């Protein structure tokens, strides 16, 4: 079944509107990546922080107060009119909410726990619903007064890719007529200190697929789609295919040959009834860790033997973890949107020092365009702990 991505709201370090994110994405503007101290002891790290003011949580749902939900609200307000029209057309009980996250309101919980440890009492404004993993979906459903299925998926870095896949299944099964789907994650000490303990954090701006790569940068973002069975009057961008695999190689390290990642990409192609040669652009998971980039290079070579224009957009946004799958699907959506009249593609930013141990890939740059020879089909990869792999294909529906 074709699942149309009719509306998109997003916010990340690149900006707080589709227009601003598009402009800075295609220009390769990484000024949103800033060095900040306080996240981990004794050093500053580059992070993809959202610096714009966030909307307050409405009083009627104030118990859901968290930065995570504020980011999600900022994205939802961008498509509020589309959501209202869907509610009017389908009814509140026929609209689902499926969101991916890995943090939820854990930063607010950490701050409240620190108060409890000092004073043996929680702050007056603390509520468990701030930190509950299902909070983002519960918050959106409560704010919009929706009564359709509402739940959160948390599979680390594939969370919001799985949310899009699950939303399409909900439409296909007749559980919903429309689904608000996407992902959200916010910067928090627990996450950054955890990746620092794994020695996976780069002290510099990340450098994916370079021989000098030395780890990730973390970011925060929210990306929210309105998915339905029918095309929007302005475009026909849709989720055409999805592939999922779980190779269960290791709790945190990817399977080194790329077998699981390759399986996910091949499944997505079969699901979309496309050949590898029809993909015009590939958004790589591209974390800039030694193991991910080596594995993903092998997997891409195994699927796209003739090459495919590709890039990692994490140097522009940071790795937004539970939001990354939806955010990078959104980057593909923006590449296909009618407003992208120049057919620009997201550039690959790195130092140009290719790793001689990795297969050579076909990198995009700031002047890259989706040429007439390239079909308007794009793939986006997300790979997570535990060998959890997702590939999505987004493009113009026939």
Regions found by a protein language model. Give the residues of each.
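Condensing-enzyme catalytic core mediating Claisen C-C bond formation in acyl metabolism
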Residues: 2-11, 27-37, 42-45, 201, ...
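Conserved catalytic cysteine-centered active-site region
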Residues: 33-77, 94, 104-118, 123-166, ...
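Structural signature of cysteine-dependent C-C bond-forming condensing enzymes
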Residues: 85-96, 113-125, 142-150, 172-179, ...
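N-terminal amphipathic, basic-rich helices that act as targeting or association modules
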Residues: 1-5, 65-81, 87-91
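ACP-dependent fatty acid/polyketide chain-elongation machinery
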Residues: 1-61, 230-242, 330-349, 390, ...
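Conserved small-residue
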Residues: 7, 25, 76, 97, ...
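Short, well-ordered amphipathic alpha-helical segments that serve as non-catalytic structural scaffolds
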Residues: 72-84, 134-136, 222, 257-273, ...
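Glycine-rich phosphate/pyrophosphate-binding beta-alpha loops
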Residues: 13, 103, 156, 287-289, ...
